[in-house]
Design a protein with these regions (language model features):
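Structural detector of coil-to-beta-strand junctions
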Residues: 116, 144-146, 166-167, 199-203, ...
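Right-handed parallel beta-helix
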Residues: 97, 102, 123-134, 149-165, ...
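Extracellular beta-strand-rich solenoid/capping regions of secreted or surface-exposed proteins
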Residues: 68-74, 85-101, 110-128, 134-150
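Extracellular beta-rich repeat passengers
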Residues: 229-400
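Bacterial Sec-dependent N-terminal signal peptides
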Residues: 4-25
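Extracellular calcium-associated, cysteine-rich motifs in secreted modular proteins
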Residues: 399-458
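Acidic Gly/Asp/Thr-rich repetitive segments characteristic of extracellular carbohydrate-active
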Residues: 33-78
C-alpha cells in the first residue's frame, strides 16, 4: 500500500456545533505541550500539528510510503502501518515541523537500522518511540543520531544504539553562537552500546544560553561520555549503568561557562567487561570538572558494589572534588556548587527520587510501545542484574540478538478513510470514519484528533 497523505486546515474549537469543529470527548491534559508528559526545554515543540498526515506503508529505504519520503518534507504527522526493520542504505535527514509517532506501528514496531540519522536543522520536531540502531554498516566516526544546530525538539521513548562515534549527540559549533542547538529535550529514552574502539554515549554541548534537558533516560554500556556536557543542561532522573574507564557524567573540562541542574540520578557500576575480555573499570560518577562548571547537585545515588541489589549511597560534594599538590600547596578542584537550581531551568513536573526513576525506567523506559524489542529487553536484563551483567561491545554481533533481532509484524487496524486513525477509535470517540479531514481538526483540549489517538495508545 502506498503512503497516504491526509491534508486539511486544522480549526480551533469554539464549542458551537459539530459540523466544522471536533467536539472533544478526549481528556483535558491542561497546558498544550508537545504531548502530555513533555518536560524540559523542548516541551513546547508542536511538530506537525498544523500540517498533514503521512502514513509509512513500506519498510523500503526509499520511495513512496517510506520513512525517508515521510521525513523529506516539513509539516507532517507521521504514523506507521507497517512493522519491522527499515534498513537504511544512506544517512537519513529529518525536515522541520514533524511529528514522528512510531508507537502507531503494529506488531513490535519499527527499527531504523544500518546508518546514521540527523536532526540538524529539524526545528520544531516531536519524535517518539523510534528505535535507531546504526551499527557497523554506518561510517566510522559517525554518530547514530545527532544534532549540530536547530531548536525546539523533543525526543521521547527513543532507543538509540550502536553509534561508531557517539550514540546521540547534541553538539553545537562554539564558533557559531547564533546557530547553537537550543530548547531540546531527550526523555524516557535508552542511549547505549556505543561501539568500540570509540564507545560513547554522547556529547551534550551548547553554550550557556542554550538549554538541553535530559530527563529519565538510561545510559548503558558506553565506555565514556554518559554524557559529556557543556552549556545549559538539566540532567534529572537518569540512570547510568556499566560505563567504563572513560567517564560517566563528564563536566565540560573547559573554560567555557556551564550551568547544570543535576538531580536525583542513579549511577550503577556494571561488570565493565570489554568485548575482548578485558575489564575496563569504572570512573567516578563525575569527572573533569572545574570552576567554570556551575552545578546544583542533589539526590544523586551511586551503587558500586555489584551485589545484585540496588543499595547505593547518596553522593556528596566531596565526591565531586579532587585534591592535588602544586608547589607544596594543596589545591582543591571542583565545580562551582550552586545552592539551588538556576531559575532559568524549566520545572520538571514529573520529578522522582533516584530509586523511583530506576524503577520507572525498568518498567516503562525506551521504545516500549507497541512492544519492547529484543535489544531493549537485553539492555533491561543487564541493568536489572545490578552489577552482575554488562558488556561494552565492538559490533552489534557481540550481543545475543546478533543485530536488530526479530521484530514481529502484524496487520494495521482497519482505517476506512485512510486518515491514520483506526475505525474502532473513530467509532468510539464519535468521529467520522468516512471523513479523512477530521484527523487534523483541533479538539477542545488543543490537540488534533490524530494526536489524541496517538496519546491513547497503550
Amino acid at each position: 500500500m502506498a503512503g497516504v497523505l491526509c491534508a486539511c486546515s486544522p480549526k480551533s474549537y469554539d464549542g458551537r456545533d459539530g459540523n466544522n469543529f471536533s467536539v472533544s470527548p478526549f481528556p483535558d491534559y491542561g497546558e498544550v505541550l508537545a504531548f502530555p508528559g513533555a518536560e524540559g526545554y523542548g516541551r513546547h515543540a508542536t511538530g506537525g500539528r498544523t500540517g498533514e498526515v503521512y502514513q509509512v506503508t513500506t519498510l523500503a529505504d526509499s520511495g513512496k510510503g517510506s520513512l525517508r519520503d515521510a521525513v523529506s518534507k516539513p509539516n507532517r504527522i507521521i504514523v506507521f502501518k507497517v512493522a519491522g526493520v527499515i534498513k537504511l542504505e544512506s544517512p537519513l535527514d529529518f525536515s522541520k515541523n514533524l511529528t514522528i509517532a512510531a508507537q502507531t506501528a503494529p506488531g513490535d514496531g519499527v527499527v531504523v537500522y544500518g546508518n546514521r540519522i540527523s536532526f540538524s536543522g529539524a526545528d520544531n520536531l516531536i519524535c517518539r518511540y523510534l528505535r535507531v540502531r546504526m551499527g557497523m554498516n554506518g561510517r566510522e566516526g559517525k554518530d547514530a543520531a545527532g544534532i549540530a544546530y536547530g531548536s525546539d525538539m523533543i525526543f521521547d521513548h527513543m532507543s538509540v544504539t550502536w553509534g561508531r562515534d557517539e550514540c546521540f549527540s547534541i553538539n553545537g559549533d562554539p564558533k557559531k553562537p547564533a546557530d547553537q542547538p537550543r530548547n531540546i529535550t531527550i526523555q524516557n529514552s535508552f542511549i547505549g552500546q556505543g561501539l568500540q574502539p570509540h564507545s560513547c554515549g554522547g556529547l551534550i554541548q551548547t553554550t550557556i544560553n542554550n538549554g538541553v534537558t535530559l530527563y529519565r533516560n538510561l545510559y548503558i554500556d558506553n565506555k565514556t561520555r554518559n554524557p559529556k556536557v557543556k552549556g545549559l543542561n538539566q540532567f534529572v532522573n537518569n540512570v547510568l549503568y556499566n560505563w567504563g574507564n572513560g567517564g560517566a557524567y563528564i563536566m565540560g573540562d573547559t573554560e567555557q561557562k556551564s550551568d547544570a541542574d543535576i538531580r536525583n540520578n542513579y549511577f550503577i557500576v556494571g561488570t565493565t567487561d570489554n568485548y575482548d575480555g578485558k575489564k575496563l573499570g569504572a570512573t567516578a560518577p563525575f569527572t573533569r570538572y572545574n570552576e567554570h562548571f556551575s552545578a546544583y547537585l542533589s539526590g544523586n545515588f551511586y551503587d558500586d558494589n555489584k551485589d545484585g541489589v540496588l543499595n547505593g549511597r547518596e553522593l556528596e560534594r566531596t565526591d565531586c572534588m579532587k585534591k592535588s599538590v602544586v608547589a607544596g600547596e594543596e589545591i582543591i578542584t571542583s565545580p562551582t556548587f550552586l545552592e539551588r537550581p538556576s531559575d532559568i531551568h524549566p520545572e520538571i513536573k514529573g520529578l522522582m527520587t533516584a530509586q523511583e526513576a530506576y524503577e520507572w525506567i525498568v518498567d516503562n523506559g525506551g521504545a516500549s510501545l507497541p512492544a519492547r524489542d529484543e535489544v531493549d529487553a537485553y539492555l533491561i536484563d543487564e541493568l536489572t542484574s545490578l552489577g552482575k551483567k554488562g558488556l561494552i561491545i565492538h559490533t552489534e554481533e557481540d550481543i545475543p540478538t546478533k543485530g536488530a533481532g526479530s521484530i514481529k509484524s502484524a496487520n494495521a487496524p482497519a482505517d476506512t478513510d485512510n486518515d491514520g486513525m483506526p475505525d474502532e477509535f473513530e467509532d468510539k470517540y464519535g468521529l467520522d470514519k468516512n471523513d479523512p479531514a477530521d484527523a487534523m481538526k483541533i479538539a477542545s483540549n488543543g490537540y488534533t484528533n490524530i494526536e489524541n489517538y496517538i496519546f491513547l495508545i497503550k
